[in-house]
Amino acid sequence: MTITDLVLILFIAALLAYALYDQFIMPRRNGPTLLSIALLRRGRIDSVIFVGLVAILIYNNVTSHGAQMTTWLLSALALMGFYIFWIRTPRIIFKQRGFFFANVWIEYNRIKEMNLSEDGVLVMQLEQRRLLIRVRNIDDLEKIYKLLIENQ
């Protein structure tokens, strides 16, 4: 096994750990989930570039008769990238004392002000940071509003 294979295994393990944390562990942290809302995906161009570069590496490894193990590991990396970028949906998860946004726990008392833009983006101003929450379904904004009113 080469150093390349070890690095690929490390990246695959990291992506798998992230996917498991995001899908199974994070919703169970910090109490029961009160509301889970699907968000819009960010630009997919980065994911297209990543999967495209991995596909080029697979092609290069196959045409140069590289190690078959490396080809399988590159294929697994491409599949993990495909899952994380295209199948998994980003979510905002509301709990009793706060919420998870982009895998970061934010308590409700950190919210200094909230606004709704004309194009349906909920803007939450924290102490030093602004969160732009783009929901997939515009009706979910009302659910978020009701939940925040009940918990504040």
UniProtKB/Swiss-Prot annotation:
Sorted UniProt keywords: Cell inner membrane, Cell membrane, Membrane, Transmembrane, Transmembrane helix
All ranges on the Periplasmic side of the membrane: 1-5, 66
Compartments in which it is found: Cell inner membrane
Membrane topology: Multi-pass membrane protein
Domain of life: Bacteria
Ranges annotated as spanning the membrane: 6-26, 45-65, 67-87
One Pfam family it belongs to: DUF986
Chief location of this protein within or outside the cell: membrane
Keyword Glycoprotein found: no
Side of membrane Cytoplasmic, spans: 27-44, 88-152
UniProt GO cellular component terms: plasma membrane
Family in the record: Belongs to the UPF0266 family.
Cross-referenced HAMAP family: UPF0266
Name listed for the protein in its UniProt record: UPF0266 membrane protein YobD
Source species of the chain: Salmonella typhi
Record gene name: yobD
